[in-house]
């Protein structure tokens, strides 16, 4: 019955217990009212006292067996059985006194039942040492109330026997008054007692046997130890003493407590929180902090109610101080996006508008990850306007753009000077030659002498997609020339040759190490590679054709010499990155048309796979002195020798394209002439070379070309 609290009331459950109580109390009351007075007179006054004591004992045990907790185990909470439920095996085995005893998993209570424990289907609880569920007491009989149930049976049997015996004695004494009321009530009580005596006496005898053998009704009925040994028995006397004399078992369920309502008087009220003392604890991506904000309680309540509907905070921004390359690329992307959205932005990509701000110190020239390697915008306005100032203030000028003059502002057109013989687009190098470890890994594998490599197809795609340069026009990414490029052994550069992409310090170190004498080799004739006119505009094609006509009219140069490494490798050396010295004034450069600013005479790169590969001259190879005048040469090239028997058209075709892989190499912080620092090239010319001719000296002829181009040729 204690388990019934809090559950739905079922009247049928109380019918047996109510009938038992009525018969017990009613029959005993009639016995004491009609039979005991006559027995006290006829037999002894102790008869009513004895029956009263036995009746009280029966009533006490009945009450204890009905209302006492039989030993119910509490059910597992939801957080306790998360790991065990739906994955636990049905049985677990434990060993008790050397005998294996199974423990069954209870799906209702969600735990393994201890030995001798069973789940009561009526009470819906697991009861320790479950015996049976008795409907006469409306309770389960378990470890905690089995003693009272057993004593109830014993006392009830004794009481029934007493009532029946003393009633029979009363009838025998009053045989003449069988028609009387007292004798009739006594005979009725005897019938009730006689009817209940048979089942109660039989049940009592059964439990006496179970107690003596140390078993429960459930174990006896199910036959768990029918063919084996009971591990729970301790002998007859010990079993009886354990049931009757042992201390009561502990209670596993707490007693229900009623909630107490306490009235709080004004002295015990909580103080009001002021608006300035509200402490808000925030959590921002794992960082907790306390902020004191001047907010009212109403605003905090509104914020709390809207917190469930608010969007999550944005992810934290990356730490740009830790990743130099990421910071550089983000800066480039932001600047390029802002430039593309401008009103005066040209339709072509604007990568030429960026140039690296190099420092004149050796540290910034040698370390590409320094802070001076950030790409700046607008520094070109500070460039020196004369060659003398540019030699004192070394810096790099950006590559020429193919944009029309109408799309460029006057300031921008003046800040980027054009070099007619500048080769290759370095827009990719301006954007990606600084700041990332991936590009440093490429710099270690790229050859500084300008030889092409087989793995520049992906970088060529970047050049095509990222910038519009002269190389991307001559050799598109889908050209088969990309597929046929093969890397060969790196030729030894000639004396006085300096890579145009090395820093000043590295160039000086390598210049001191290279002193091999030049060995003249025989020239090799080869047809020039045809120029691809597919991607060129009409004006550029006309300029190229005009220059080719001029080159065909010029006579071939007498004996040229090749550098020693090119005779065997079959790989042409790059004639520098196209920083030829400027001889015209800055005013002439600013007035030139966009067509003049496009490098002319840059045919497509020839295939390298043929055995009789193209072999051109190196930048530092000596040339004979004054030769017949020919067009298409600047004064920086007039002081060098050319291989004999090779026409100028072939020589122009020998100039290779600057591959995108070469664009990634580091550039020196000095203005260059023919790939060499101007100070070095002018101060110490190599053997077999003549000093550069000045435009003011004799022997220099100026020839006007297409579009107002002026060529200065040594005679």
Swiss-Prot record:
Question: Subcellular localization, per the record?
Answer: Cell membrane
Which parts of the sequence carry Phosphotyrosine? 91
Q: Keywords of this protein's UniProt record, alphabetized?
A: Acyltransferase, Cell membrane, Immunity, Innate immunity, Lipid transport, Lipoprotein, Membrane, Methylation, Palmitate, Phosphoprotein, Transferase, Transmembrane, Transmembrane helix, Transport
Omega-N-methylarginine modifications at: 617, 697
Give the Enzyme Commission number.
Answer: 2.3.1.225
**Modification note:** Phosphorylation regulates association with endocytic proteins and its subcellular localization. Phosphorylation by LYN during fatty acid uptake leads to inactivation of the activity.
Q: Where are the catalytic residues?
A: 134 (s-palmitoyl cysteine intermediate)
Q: How does it sit in the membrane?
A: Multi-pass membrane protein
Ranges in the topological domain labelled Cytoplasmic: 1-13, 60-148, 213-715
Q: Provide the top EC class.
A: transferase
Family, according to the entry, reads as follows:
Belongs to the DHHC palmitoyltransferase family. ERF2/ZDHHC9 subfamily.
What is the protein name given in its UniProt record?
Palmitoyltransferase ZDHHC5
Question: What's the source species' lineage?
Answer: Eukaryota, Metazoa, Chordata, Craniata, Vertebrata
